[in-house]
């Protein structure tokens, strides 16, 4: 059963992956996954779904593909959305952090310059350092692992949705 690729979704071909020096082992794992499902390996110029990449390699593989394809704006907007989620989750109220994310979005959209982005990033770094110093002794360790796993899955789902795929089961290997 071949996977249907949504109209307008970002895809990659074997040739594009090869030309971008993809890891041979990771490529083989994705192709094996497709062969097990479809009974054959796709031709060099056949589009490969980023959902197939995600099923085998997770969010790291999808991010690599998007970088190899030159999808810099999509990756920047993904980073902005992840940063916003993190700020909301951590209940960050310092306006410098929120401004940095806003400027990063403007930069991704071509509305802010590199110097403006640098200034906002430095201010956010200072805010983060100040907050870390104030809350250093908080009990973060126990919840960190579970929270990271849940966030990783949420980020993969978000990235695939942004790349043109509908919300999907994000369990790697599922």
Where are these regions (language model features)?
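Short, glycine-biased loop/turn motifs at secondary-structure junctions and
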Residues: 1-174
């Amino acid at each position: 059963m071949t996977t249907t690729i949504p109209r307008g979704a970002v895809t990659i071909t074997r040739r594009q992956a090869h030309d971008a020096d993809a890891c041979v082992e990771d490529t083989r794992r994705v192709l094996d996954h497709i062969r097990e499902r479809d009974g054959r390996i796709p031709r060099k110029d056949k589009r490969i779904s980023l959902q197939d990449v995600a099923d085998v390699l997770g969010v790291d593989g999808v991010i690599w593909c998007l970088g190899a394809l030159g999808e810099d704006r999509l990756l920047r907007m993904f980073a902005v959305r992840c940063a916003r989620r993190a700020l909301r989750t951590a209940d960050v109220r310092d306006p410098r952090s929120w401004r940095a994310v806003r400027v990063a979005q403007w930069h991704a959209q071509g509305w802010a310059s590199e110097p403006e982005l640098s200034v906002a990033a430095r201010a956010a770094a200072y805010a983060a350092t100040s907050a870390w110093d104030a809350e250093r002794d908080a009990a973060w360790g126990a919840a960190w692992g579970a929270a990271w796993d849940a966030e990783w899955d949420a980020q993969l789902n978000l990235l695939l949705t942004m790349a043109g795929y509908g919300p999907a089961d994000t369990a790697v290997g599922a």
